[in-house]
Design a protein with these regions (language model features):
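Cytosolic regulatory regions of ion transport systems
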Residues: 1-132
């Protein structure tokens, strides 16, 4: 499976490590060159330096034939916009976004339910913790 991961922090790096072990074709996009270099030195993955919400970065990452986009940057807005760009321009079939703000998750869930923001799976870590 061809998977693009946006964000090379702790979550993105861990995802890349686990998914690369499962023989997936992984590309990680991030704006921090040193972080990408460290990931690439220890994993068999591709990296792209850039903003994951920019169409050119997604294209360089292979979005035109990617099976999945996982957006786990530290910005909800970049994550949601990246999913929208990937769907609109490249028809990426599966889009997963980390969304941390309760304002998006609790008060304005209709944004996702209506398809206005094309996210197939929302990861809301703070919401999960507070619900349990």
């Amino acid at each position: 499976m061809k998977i693009i991961i946006l964000g090379a922090g702790q979550v993105g790096g861990t995802l890349a490590e686990h998914l690369a072990d499962e023989q997936n074709d992984i590309t990680v996009v991030d704006e921090r060159a040193a972080t990408l270099k460290r990931l690439q030195e220890r994993l068999d993955i591709r990296t792209v330096l850039g903003n994951g919400a920019h169409p050119s970065a997604l294209l360089n990452a292979g979005a035109e034939d990617a099976d999945m986009l996982i957006a786990v940057t530290d910005s909800d807005e970049i994550n949601m916009l990246a999913c929208s760009v990937a769907f609109t321009l490249y028809r990426t079939p599966t889009k997963i976004s980390r969304v941390r703000s309760a304002d998006y998750l609790a008060k304005h869930q209709a944004l996702f339910e209506s398809g206005s923001i094309p996210v197939d799976v929302i990861i809301g870590p703070e919401q999960l913790v507070t619900k349990n």
